[in-house]
Protein backbone atom coordinates (compact mmCIF):
# COMPACT_ATOMS: atom_id res chain seq x y z
CA UNK A 1 0.00 0.00 0.00
CA UNK A 2 1.10 3.55 -0.66
CA UNK A 3 2.19 5.71 2.21
CA UNK A 4 0.16 8.80 3.13
CA UNK A 5 1.04 12.36 2.16
CA UNK A 6 1.18 13.70 5.71
CA UNK A 7 4.89 14.64 5.40
CA UNK A 8 4.31 17.23 2.63
CA UNK A 9 3.19 20.68 3.73
CA UNK A 10 2.35 23.82 1.73
CA UNK A 11 4.67 26.75 2.44
CA UNK A 12 4.84 30.39 1.31
CA UNK A 13 8.04 31.99 0.02
CA UNK A 14 8.42 35.78 0.30
CA UNK A 15 11.00 38.07 -1.32
CA UNK A 16 13.56 39.51 1.10
CA UNK A 17 14.94 42.30 -1.11
CA UNK A 18 11.60 43.95 -1.97
CA UNK A 19 11.10 45.23 1.58
CA UNK A 20 14.47 47.01 1.46
CA UNK A 21 13.69 48.62 -1.91
CA UNK A 22 10.20 49.76 -0.90
CA UNK A 23 8.29 47.88 -3.61
CA UNK A 24 5.50 45.32 -3.13
CA UNK A 25 6.76 41.86 -2.15
CA UNK A 26 6.32 38.85 -4.40
CA UNK A 27 5.13 35.58 -2.91
CA UNK A 28 5.25 32.01 -4.19
CA UNK A 29 3.65 28.87 -2.76
CA UNK A 30 5.26 25.45 -2.92
CA UNK A 31 5.43 22.21 -0.97
CA UNK A 32 8.24 20.72 1.06
CA UNK A 33 8.83 17.49 2.92
CA UNK A 34 9.02 18.47 6.59
CA UNK A 35 10.83 15.23 7.50
CA UNK A 36 13.74 15.75 5.10
CA UNK A 37 13.90 19.56 5.20
CA UNK A 38 13.41 20.73 8.77
CA UNK A 39 15.00 24.19 8.43
CA UNK A 40 13.44 27.12 6.56
CA UNK A 41 13.67 27.00 2.79
CA UNK A 42 15.55 29.69 0.79
CA UNK A 43 15.20 29.72 -3.01
CA UNK A 44 16.11 32.11 -5.83
CA UNK A 45 12.89 33.07 -7.63
CA UNK A 46 11.89 35.81 -10.09
CA UNK A 47 10.40 38.98 -8.62
CA UNK A 48 8.28 40.74 -11.28
CA UNK A 49 8.24 44.02 -9.31
CA UNK A 50 12.05 44.27 -9.29
CA UNK A 51 12.37 42.54 -12.70
CA UNK A 52 15.17 40.24 -11.50
CA UNK A 53 15.84 37.03 -9.58
CA UNK A 54 15.97 37.51 -5.80
CA UNK A 55 16.17 35.41 -2.66
CA UNK A 56 12.83 34.19 -1.34
CA UNK A 57 12.60 32.82 2.21
CA UNK A 58 9.96 30.66 3.81
CA UNK A 59 7.53 32.54 6.06
CA UNK A 60 5.11 31.24 8.68
UniProtKB/Swiss-Prot annotation:
Keywords: Ribonucleoprotein, Ribosomal protein. One of its GO terms (biological process) is translation. InterPro entries: Ribosomal_bL33 (IPR001705), Ribosomal_bL33_sf (IPR038584), Ribosomal_zn-bd (IPR011332). The keyword Ribonucleoprotein applies. GO terms for cellular component: cytoplasm; ribonucleoprotein complex; ribosome. The keyword Ribonucleoprotein applies. One of its GO terms (molecular function) is structural constituent of ribosome. HAMAP family: Ribosomal_bL33 (MF_00294). Belongs to the bacterial ribosomal protein bL33 family. This is Large ribosomal subunit protein bL33. It comes from Chlorobaculum tepidum (strain ATCC 49652 / DSM 12025 / NBRC 103806 / TLS).
